From Swiss-Prot:
The lineage of its organism: Viruses, Duplodnaviria, Heunggongvirae, Uroviricota, Caudoviricetes. This is Putative gene 50 protein.
């Protein structure tokens, strides 16, 4: 898998997790 794609998915996951936790 492309490193950039993997990093983007990881950041997106962290963003979604942060939104869920803070709400």
């Amino acid at each position: 898998m492309d490193k950039l794609a993997a990093g983007g998915l990881y950041l997106l996951f962290l963003l979604l997790a942060g939104i869920i936790v803070t709400h």
